[in-house]
């Protein structure tokens, strides 16, 4: 992200992005050079998107160099043509390069326009992002299939090394609990919140299908926040807390886990509790979301303005505690010793 790497698109790159969004180009390859986003290659359409795909995309992917690829589909949404965003990070590239491209990924998407991006893919080998790989990706979105042990291991390696691929596959066990997959819609909403395009995201667990899905993204002011907390079901909430502190205007993301006591089933309580830590790990690591405070509540009535302010800015002790003198050993003390000065010693000798 821009606040992490400082890498942004120049005006020339933004102009090319604008022409691409209008349909002039089928493909853009973007690289990072001298701490700037640069266009490495542009291709105009020559056939339908699926006929162009492999011949356009695969030759541009280098074995030891990460890059981004934006590939235009023939379909359109309300904002214009839809695009596939490919984050290419080959296994043999340097770790520093992988981390740099991972940290700049959100910036590029924001500069291009996230509303134009229909699908996102991440790949370490060309098969991952080939036309066949894209079709497998679409199939997995409609009906997720369990990963094999080898696929699961590879996915974990990608997450640990690159910190950019979000779990949208199948559930897996972690040391902290059960990591259910996050729906694409929920992930996109969290990304918009992180980019300050939304101020509230509520997630719920689809227990039957074992997936975390989007509940709502209603625009929410602080006074409305208690109304967003269900009284009969658990939820995860991400709230953009806008406030002033010591003269500074702040926008802080707060995570709220609401569990209305025993009105929920035991299974629901266990699942929400087990999925909480893995969800936060994905959001903080993969989206680089800075969550300033994590709160657990029973009902929305607790979410007053004073409560939230004190949670985000805990009161400091007015006085520093003085160092406590160590206590002597318990029980009887030994014989008291008197240390004489030199003058006293000489007088005694005489």
Swiss-Prot record:
GO biological-process terms attached to the record: actin filament depolymerization; barbed-end actin filament capping; positive regulation of neuron projection development; regulation of lamellipodium assembly
Residues modified to N-acetylserine: 2
Segments of this protein annotated with the region Disordered: 316-350
ADF-H domain sequence ranges: 2-139, 177-313
Modified residues (Phosphothreonine): 349
Signal peptide range in chain numbering: none
InterPro entries cross-referenced by the UniProt entry: ADF-H, ADF-H/Gelsolin-like_dom_sf, Twinfilin
One Pfam family per UniProt: Cofilin_ADF
Post-translational modification: Phosphorylated on serine and threonine residues.
Keywords: Acetylation, Actin-binding, Cytoplasm, Cytoskeleton, Phosphoprotein, Repeat
Gene Ontology MF term list: actin binding; actin filament binding; actin monomer binding
Protein name according to UniProt: Twinfilin-1
Record lineage: Eukaryota, Metazoa, Chordata, Craniata, Vertebrata
């Amino acid at each position: 992200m821009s606040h992490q790497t400082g890498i942004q698109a120049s005006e020339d790159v933004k102009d090319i992005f604008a022409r691409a969004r209008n349909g002039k180009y089928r493909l853009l390859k973007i690289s990072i050079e001298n701490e700037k986003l640069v266009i490495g290659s542009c291709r105009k359409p020559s056939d339908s998107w699926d006929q162009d795909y492999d011949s356009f995309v695969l030759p541009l992917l280098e074995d030891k160099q990460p890059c981004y690829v934006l590939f235009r589909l023939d379909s359109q949404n309300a904002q214009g043509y839809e695009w596939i965003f490919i984050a290419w990070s080959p296994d043999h590239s340097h770790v520093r390069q992988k981390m740099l491209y991972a940290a700049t990924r959100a910036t590029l998407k924001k500069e291009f326009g996230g509303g134009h991006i229909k699908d996102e893919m991440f790949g370490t080998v060309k098969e991952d992002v080939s036309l066949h790989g894209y079709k497998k990706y679409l199939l997995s979105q409609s009906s997720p299939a369990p990963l094999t042990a080898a696929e699961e291991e590879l996915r974990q390696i990608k997450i640990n090394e690159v910190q950019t691929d979000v779990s949208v596959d199948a559930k897996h066990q972690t040391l902290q609990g059960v990591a259910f997959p996050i729906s694409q819609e929920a992930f996109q909403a969290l990304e918009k919140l992180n980019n300050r395009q939304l101020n509230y995201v509520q997630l719920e667990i689809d227990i039957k299908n074992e997936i975390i899905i989007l509940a709502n993204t209603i625009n929410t002011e602080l006074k409305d926040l208690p109304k967003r907390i269900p009284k009969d079901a658990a939820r995860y909430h991400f709230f953009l807390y806008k406030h002033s502190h010591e003269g500074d205007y702040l926008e802080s993301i707060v995570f709220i886990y609401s569990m209305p006591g025993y009105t929920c089933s035991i299974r629901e309580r266990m699942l929400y509790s087990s999925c909480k830590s893995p969800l936060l790990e994905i959001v903080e690591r993969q989206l680089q979301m800075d969550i300033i405070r994590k709160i657990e509540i029973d009902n929305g009535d607790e979410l007053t303005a004073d409560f939230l302010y004190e949670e985000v800015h805990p009161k400091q002790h007015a006085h520093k505690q003085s160092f406590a003198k160590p206590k002597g050993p318990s029980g009887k003390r030994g014989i008291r010793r008197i240390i004489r000065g030199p003058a006293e010693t000489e007088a005694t000798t005489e």
